[in-house]
Amino acid sequence: MGRKKREFNRLRLDSGQHRRIMLVSALLGALAFLPVGLRLYSLMVTNYDYYSSLALRNQTRTTTVTADRGDIFDRNMNILATSVSVENVYLDPHELKQSRADIPEIARTLGEILGKDPTWIEEQAADIRRRYKQVGTRIDEETAGKIRDYINEKGISGIHLEPTSQRVYPYETLAAQVVGFTNASNEGCEGVEAAYNSFLAGSTGRVITTKGNNEMDMPFSYENYVSSRQGDSVILTLDATVQACLEKQLSAAIARYDVQNGAFGLVMNCKTGEILAMATLGSYDPNNYLEIADEGTAAQLEEMKRVYLAEPEGSEAYEAGKTAYGEALSAARLKQWRNRVISDGYEPGSTFKVLTMSAALDCGAIDLNTPFHCSGSEQIPGRAQRLHCWRSTGHGAEKTPQALQNSCNIAFAHIALKLGGERFYEYVKNFGVLEKTGIDLAGESKGVFFDKALVTDTDKWGTASLTSGSFGQTFKITPLQLVRAISSVVNGGQLMEPYIVSEILDADGNTVMKAEPTVVRGTISQETSDTMRTLIESVVTEGTAKNAKVAGFSIGGKTGTSEKIDVFDENGQRVQDKIVSFVGIAPMDDPEYIILAALDTPSRTTGIYISGGVMAAPTVGAVMADVLPYLGVKQSFSEDDLAGKQIVMEDLTGMTAKDAQALLKKEGLTAAISGSGETVTGQIPSPGQTVPGGSQVLLFLGQTPEPETVKVPDFYGMNRQQASDAAGALGLYILVTGNDEISTGVTVTAQNVAKDTEVPAGTTITLVFADTAARD
């Protein structure tokens, strides 16, 4: 009995011990498995996204499919910016190593095809820390074909061609600041490319494929394609022909007047706000946007670079020179990319008088018979300094029309006093001078105008700001602000919102967005607008802007000459540099187009009087002579205008002399007869040549004229009679443009055919006449 009890107790002990052992084992097992469990939890739950992504990257390859960027067109569907297909070449060093490729041989071959240093390519291929090493950028189809053939011939794994696109600007420098450019990442920078990047860019696609343990693609195992979306195309209001005409005449003016700091200009529809042309010169080529286009600036930068590179690398002089060079290069690039028409404020000078007079007439502060007197200078109440008119001898007695025609500062100071600071400020505000225009381009500024108190609280601040402001001095606005404001003066009093993009189309040609003219607010009454149109036209017919005349067109406008009062030389002295400008409008019976041309810092070495009337007015006149016929504005010639009318000669041979003379008379031409007989056998000018109205045509009867060439004389500085005599002596004709007054002070300032050029007898030479006497 006792033995059985002991046996039972032993078994019970063994059972309890066993349970304890099992429990301890379970606990130890749990403790041992805990890190593994936590690790599994981390892998499968906490960091699931990370490891899933890592596995996906190891098992798949993603290739980017670049979206085609949309095109940019002018209003006539001429392509201003487009994209062409190119390819990038990249190496996968890891893949090259896995495939045991002959790296030196690959480097030599690619170096030869791409024109790159083989040693550099070999270094890229050896960098196994990276899976993507680009060795060729935007190569053409022919070069890509050579690389593709090499890959296939050698069976190489690790060299890849990546399709992409390259932006191309067919018109090169034309409207460069408006169109803008794209950077190396194909993102829009500057101009329309930047402002409408979200439309133009489209969306990038991708192809995802699996890859095996040898890093080769396995497209039949798995492939996922996310298509790209082609960018939308943008149609501008810009007209490439009008833009080219504007830039041509601005370039000619820069050369003619030795302009030191470039020029800017604008052509706008004053009824709608559409921009037909917008130019900043000097310009740049967006195909090579990092290259400095101005030769003088480029030479200075090269010299800076040469100087610092001559210093020991790492020395203080080297580092300082390198920094200075980098800053100068960056500043030069930003300057050539800058659209001055919307981004830079300038003192508008006397062009602003149009707004001051409009305001004064509109509110009744003056009328057309308000008298003024200019003696050349006057001590205006509330001004510390004596006010001077641009004409030192004064204009004498004048009324409101003459005040504008003469661009008289003294008269406008008194107009401002009659208008008063409160009304002056409110009208200026209404004209949009204190706000951005809202144009659909990036980088617009709004200029800098007076604080309201400076012009309204004359008891405290005097009248200097009010009176100087009346003729466009001591404040700054942008060229576009000025043009928009003056447009409202002549279009019936409607301030328009200017715009550069007329329509956006998707890849299928569907309209995504279409712009419409937008009236911001009214500025003056229709009656005041009608009056101002008459006054503005009289500035060209009788005032300081006679040099802007174009035969057959009714043109109005206002000249401006402003000092750059915030520019100082290296000694801290204020320079005497000027910006000369002219705003022209046509046709004045129903204004449609407004054109601004401004020349920044004409040289004093040319001997030509620096003023808007002498320099900018004929520049705008030349633009109008080019673009108004193209834009469909009808010409109407009076007897006085005939010398500026171009008549295309018909073929008169075979006609009777009587019939030929009758036809010429109908065209406003006369005839001289050479030879005898009844039938015309030859003529000078030849058929198809142009001849000015009122000219004499030489008809040959019974004989044929021998072809004759003559050298074009230098007409520069000749008056109308002298030029006519010189041309007639050589059998040439002259087409008169610009100032058509017959006086000794009106002389030739430009000719369309260079002196000593050989041309056929009977050729018409276009001469620009201008009065170079002192004019505002």
Spans of features found by a protein language model:
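Extracytoplasmic
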Residues: 65-68, 75, 83-86, 130, ...
